Amino acid sequence: LRANQFRRHKSHVIVFFIFIVSNCGGLLTPLGDPPLYLGFLKGVPFWWTFYRLIPIWALTLLILLFIFHLIDDRIFDDEETHVRGSLIQTIQEAQQPIHIEGWANVFCLGGILTTVMLSGYSLNPYLEAHCGAWASALSRLIQIAVMLVFAVVSYKRTPLVIHEENQFGFGPIIEVAVLFFGIFGAMIPALTLLEAKGQTIAITHPWAYFWLSGFLSSFLDNAPTYLSYASLAAGQHGISPSHLGDLASQYPKILAAISCGSVFMGANSYIGNGPNFMVRAIAEQARVKMPSFGGYMLWSGAILIPVFILMTFIFF
């Protein structure tokens, strides 16, 4: 936002940020998106997503970046003809070039990533062996507590001037928390119905899993949607939903389709993935006029859906 502060039209930059950074870019590892992390906790190998999904990830991002380049170039050239002086020169002569501050927070970020990885590699298996049915809840509780400690340390140790320069505030976080509390309540009946009637749904092809998981992920949270469809696929093939690693090894194309549908199509609407709405709230706090809910879906429908159709024909 600060790098583009001199520009008149910035909303397209934020829209593509949501497409690429908040959603599609997180496909490679369980650290990138909650659906993949839930799969990791259920036995999917950590590096399986990297080795299996990197061609899909690379082609999708290449196409999206190319489309963004075309759109941004067109808008930038149009701005150049309507501003006094050179916009490029204004940006190049900015008094404060792009730089990074707050390097101490790298330790806290590393601590959070380590916590996430250890939860899947050691903590979760240990608790399952000793705590039975309480293992999942205890694992999440411990993980959340440790991550909160790192978050508080990061917030307290960061100089106030950095927060002020980045216009940091808790408003967007609170707004997203309230919204998704309501979404989680609304999605429980839909997911319960899917689990109860899932065995009667005749889904056999990977492309069907891709689009069905993607459709629900567009309007419900993508993490439980992923788990529901992965469990459905496992049950249809005689695999325990608690051991999705077997699904990854025996039916990799199906799990790949569910993974891509859940991660990619979370970008189809503001409520498909938690970061989407948070990015929008942060942008609006910085006085960037963002598309409405329907307006954003026009962007995603015009850009993402054709890309996903292409991915279907190539990979699924």
PLM region spans:
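Membrane-interfacial helix-loop connectors
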Residues: 1-9, 13-21, 38-54, 188-268, ...
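Alpha-helical transmembrane segments and their helix-start/interface "positive-inside/aromatic belt" motifs
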Residues: 10-16, 96-108, 167-177, 297-300
